[in-house]
Amino acid sequence: MPQLDSGGGGAGRGDDLGAPDELLAFQDEGEEQDDKNRDSPVGPERDLAELKSSLVNESEGAAAGAGVPGPGVRVHGEAEGAPEALGREHTSQRLFPDKLPESLEDGLKAPECTSGMYKETVYSAFNLLMPYPPASGAGQHPQPQPPLHNKPGQPPHGVPQLSPLYEHFSSPHPTPAPADISQKQGVHRPLQTPDLSGFYSLTSGSMGQLPHTVSWPSPPLYPLSPSCGYRQHFPAPTAAPGAPYPRFTHPSLMLGSGVPGHPAAIPHPAIVPSSGKQELQPYDRNLKTQAEPKAEKEAKKPVIKKPLNAFMLYMKEMRAKVIAECTLKESAAINQILGRRWHALSREEQAKYYELARKERQLHMQLYPGWSARDNYGKKKRRSREKHQESTTGGKRNAFGTYPEKAAAPAPFLPMTVL
């Protein structure tokens, strides 16, 4: 079995990186896999070997960044076999002894797709953060840094953290991870959903192809509490025209943006300025002032009753006596009794009431000389008569007002000039 080269070069020196008697069987729980896929070097084991080689690269970066004299491990090529990858996995376990074996076993369990190939491998013990951008040319893959362990208060995530990876690629100066930002400043962190894993798979070959166009939204200079009624404004998502991946933006950030006209940007009714309420008051006052003159005109014009005739004067005088004699309270029945008694009167008795009626008419004519019964009973006829008079005078009546419109002046004639 080929071993990893140490600083001196011998494979059988007995170093701690890979011993021939310590081999781990990573497929002891994969009983559902076929023997054909297990024996083929081009099948899932090749993808597994590439993922394990990326772990060795991370261990090299950890040793170089911490200043610890590394063992000088070098990778011969990306197309190594499965036995060498098993030795490298054992090396990574020795370099990171604090990782639990259960999390490594869960991370190395890759689900089978319908085509039989591994679409992606999810590592529950890593967050796959890239703290620094690549320093070499565009054609080389960046050297990954050691993975950050999950903090004791955070549950292990089953989906790779995509937003922190984008942030470190896009910013020229490295900034702390968004996990720390969310704890210090209270910035809302996007939720990781399992459906992202089916569309964006992270492998050792696709780590260097992520675009540099996505950044974490920075909090405002003066953060506002949600109780004041205003929402924080986040920058609109912008992406390069040739970017293969869109920017990840949580729906709550888009809904909370302070865009005018958006339903989420409508303030609470309690903080609406009083100027809007004051603008409505003059309009209500105008409506009231327009309705008041009409009511005043109708109230000023008293209803003039017609003078009473002889029978009405008799009824006015005898009604109280009839009500006292009879037990009936209905007005119609009382009027019938009064009518019978009126016709039973003699001519001399009726002449007395006729004389009273004549005097009543004379008094009414003196009080109201121009009065006519049509003022009380002919309102519809009076309206039609007013319309007829206005039509004969030539005035044009407006449909919404009571005043006649002025005749439109003819437009002046403009002479045409030929150019």
UniProtKB/Swiss-Prot annotation:
Protein name as catalogued: Transcription factor 7
The family this protein is said to belong to: Belongs to the TCF/LEF family.
Comp. bias regions, Basic and acidic residues: 35-50, 86-109
Annotated spans, CTNNB1-binding: 1-60
Listed InterPro entries: Catenin-bd_sf, CTNNB1-bd_N, HMG_box_dom, HMG_box_dom_sf, TCF/LEF
Motif Nuclear localization signal per UniProt: ranges: 379-385
Region: Disordered, residue numbers: 1-111, 134-200, 374-406
Keywords: Activator, DNA-binding, Nucleus, Repressor, Transcription, Transcription regulation, Wnt signaling pathway
Provenance organism: Mus musculus (Mouse)
Single GO cellular component term: euchromatin
GO biological process, one term: negative regulation of apoptotic process
Compositionally biased region (Gly residues): 1-12
